Amino acid sequence: MAYERLGETPLDYMPCRYGASKLLFRGPRQNLTGRYAAFLGGTETYGKFISRPYPALIAARTGAKCINFGWPNAGIDVFLNDADLLAAANGAQVVVLQLPPAQNMSNRFYRVHPRRNDRFLEGSTMLRSIYPEVDMTEFHFTRHLLGHLRKVSPSRFELIRDELQTAWRARMRLLMERIGVPVILLWFSAHAPRHEADSPDLSEDPSFVTADMVEDARPMALQVVDVTVSAAALDAGTTGMMFTEFEAASAAELLGPASHEEAADALAPVISELVCG
C-alpha cells in the first residue's frame, strides 16, 4: 500500500465543474462534445484513493472519451437535483450508472443533504413516532443513524427498510426516465445481489438494494452488468491505492485497483462498441 506523510494528499483528483453544476467532479475536465460515455456513480466511480478508476481504465483500453461524473457517497437525489449533470449525461452515447445505495436519499422518514446525500439533516414526525426513545439530533450521517435504529429495534426497522426500498424503486424510474440515452446499470460490489438486504454497513453496499430491485430496473436499461468482485481482487485489498496514514482505515473499506480492473474488463467491450463504433 502507498503512504504519504500524515496530512498530505497523495492523489490530485483535479476537481472540475461542468456547466453551472455545484458539484466538483474528478478531472481532468473534458469537453462535452463528440461521442463520449458518461459514468454516474458514487465513491467507487469517483475512484477515491485510486489513481486510475474504472472509467479511466476503459478510456485507456478503448480510446473512447469517458467522462467521470462519480460523486462520493452519491444517492439518487444528487443526480436528479442537478440539471447540468443530466444535460451532460443526455449528450453521451451511453450512460453507465453505478447502482446507488438506498439509504442516501430523502424519504418519508428523513431528509438528506441535496448534494452530500450521506448527510442526515432531520427525521420526520413519522420517524420520531416510531422511535420516540431516539434523539435524532445526535446523528449526522445516514449510515450511523440507520445502524443505530436497526440495533434499537430490528422489528421496527423493517418499516424503515421497506420505505427505503420503495423510494429507491420510484426514484430510479424517475432518474432513468430523465436520461434519454441508453443506460448500462452497473452492480459493482464485494457481494452478489441478494434477495434480502437490511444492513447499512459499508460492506453491504449498495446498501438495501436487493436482487429483485435490480431486476425491476432492468427493463429500463440497455443491460445490467454484474461486477461482483472476485475473491482474488478482494484479497488484494489496498494494494496500489494511494492514501495517507490517517486515511488508511477509510481506504481499507473501499474496493481497490484490482476490483476496478475487473469492472473495466466487464464494461470495455460494450463501451467500445457504443462510443467508438
Regions found by a protein language model. Name each.
Residues 6, 16, 21, 28, ...:
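Generic signature of intrinsically disordered, low-complexity segments enriched in small/polar residues
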Residues 87-277:
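Alpha-helical cap/lid subdomain in secreted, periplasmic
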Residues 10-72, 78-90:
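Serine-esterase "nucleophile elbow" of acetyl-processing enzymes
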Residues 1-4, 55-60, 142-149:
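A broad, low-specificity signal for short, low-complexity segments enriched in glycine/proline
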Residues 1-13:
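Helix-enriched interaction subdomains in cytosolic or periplasmic regions
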Residues 1, 37-41, 98:
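Short, hydrophobic/glycine-enriched beta-strand segments
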